[in-house]
Amino acid sequence: MRREEIELLAPAGSYEGFEAAIGAGADAVYVGGAAFGARAYAKNFGEEELLRAIDTAHIHGRKLYLTVNTLLKNRELSEQLYDYLLPYYKEGLDAVIVQDMGVFKMIREMFPGMHLHASTQMTVTGPEGMKFLEEQGASRVVTARELSLEEIRRMHETSPIEIESFVHGALCYSYSGQCLMSSILGGRSGNRGRCAQPCRLPYQTALCCGENGRRSEKRKAQELCPLSLKDISTIEILPQILEAGVTSLKIEGRMKQPGYTAGVTSVYRKYLDLLFEKGAENYRVAEEDKRYLLDLFNRGGSCTGYYQMQNGPSMMAFSNEKKTGDVSPVLRKKKEKIQGTFILFPGSPAILDVSCRGIHGFASVGEVQYAQNQPLTEERIRSQMEKLGNTEYEWENLEIQMDENIFIPMKMLNEARREALESLGNELLKPYKREENNGKKRLSEDAGRKADSPKQKNLPIYISCEEKSTALALYKREGIHGMYLNADAMEVCLDDCVSRGMEMYLSLPHIMRGEMPRELLTRIREWMDRGMTGFLVRNLETFAVLRKAGLAEKCVLDHSMYTWNDEAADFWKDQKVLRNTVPLELNEGEIRHRDNRDSEMLIYGYLPLMISAQCVHKNLYGCNHKEEGVTLKDRYDKEFTAKCICNPWKTENTDFCIPCYNIIYNSIPYGLLKEKSQIDRLGVSSLRLAFTIEKPQDAVKIYEEFRAVYRDGKNPPKREYTKGHFKRGAE
């Protein structure tokens, strides 16, 4: 891999941070604007600052990327996004980092030539998902932080598009894009750039020993920060990261100060250059540089992230104590070296030719006079011309060709310098400028056109069961239109349910890493022959695998496959999916403004707050390869269950914990038992109850209560539920 193919990508939360990143050696900088970025509480850039940053980056031969890596509501997409992006597009913005497939679709159609980078918020975990995004027009994928070097290598071998991966900075406990914890608990959504970081808080933990991971007794209670990870620092394994196929090395930290950006970027710049100069076999990192990185920011030490290990307590800080050492990084302003020729002869204009990287700028001003008294010396002229001030340039060489007996006002010298540099800047920036696309597209005015649908009665009710025992308790109950089951329950329930006319869908893992087990593929073919309807899909990799197999038309998208806006829903409709699930973070009014004709709505369930590659059970109590759980009690005495998913595929011959994940569920279930009349007016196509950590007998009772209300019109019983965002919405 050649040096010019590798990019060091630094963060900037302010213009000062941007200058610090460029000055420290970043090849590219990613920033947030006034809207739609995943760091809403950073200072961020106003329009004028951002336009200036785009030009400054290009003058220095660097790139600037804009984050639009949040989920957008219909009105934001239709009324704001185009006008927000247009000036940056015309100025030459290099790429947009995107999470929302509706945003992806809109930018692809409205801003031709704009590079699209698939954000880590898309949770891209494998080669098929990457290949799918390539086909849709992405030029780069930002990998999930949880991937190993081997997984990244397989992705690189599958697709030619660029791979961007995090090499330094904070680690989220959850897979990025799969965290609702801050949103559900406090209304500040990570999917909107407003995460309050509840994962950094202390919790009292205890083992769960009850059925389905529910607590029946407490053991080894302790209080610490069980979800707080150390920061990642990969300076020692840069050769291995590059060898795996990563082309953009991303530093996290748009919320950090410019000094942090400058310090971290300068160290990675130093060692990248050393790596290409001396080769991987001679690559060594000095102890003082490791200490320097820790002095810049330290949360219980650092780790190399998931690149070389699946998870484990060595990655955990178990506290939120942040330390910095006595370091003061120097903030340097990058200056481009320029060459110039200044021609001064009496009776002719003052002509200045300046060049940078082979590109020229010119100025021709006034008229040079013969000196009446004391002529100007070359030294005096040079001294005046070298006053470049706060420009982006510094002289490497200035040749002055002049008559010995001339006079020219200082004002004219300044004018020549200013005009020549302005001309040079224009020429340097000319290749980046774009014209507005004449095919400008505005989103349909009737977005959410089914908002005032006639009141619907007796919507089909679907049931999802994460546990086989719960499925066996429910599958013969009356009134169930269809079920979403894991593989172990599907084998038992399929034939009986199909014989009674029920739709049957295989629930696939929340996270897909590696290939689908051959055993499961064989059984899927058998189940399809026996009448299985399709699949409940929860991530991009799973969908891409099924699409490749010609099964896209049998996919139901879960709420984690976000469709906040109609453009996103249309994107997936174009992929031929059966239906989507109404997002959990929209309120009633926002759902009403959405096209829900092909949408299923969750009306009951313990909401998954986090999907994590870490394991609370393993980190605190050791791994026993059982799908048990740990309770996390917060400062308000709310108890959350962190459940181990040791065998995501639910097959008999799968290696346990390779890979595994945790699901952290909310403390009380979400339930819209009293909201039937409002839901009837939303125009959704079906309803769902999701059973996860309930005891089987409790699941039966809850189902019958909802069936009585939604099918028989009975009054709802008293039971404690959270309404989630149905009434309030996410910030």
What spans do the regions from the language model cover?
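Beta/alpha (TIM)-barrel catalytic core signal, keyed to glycine-rich beta->alpha loops juxtaposed to Asp/Glu
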Residues: T123, Y562-T563
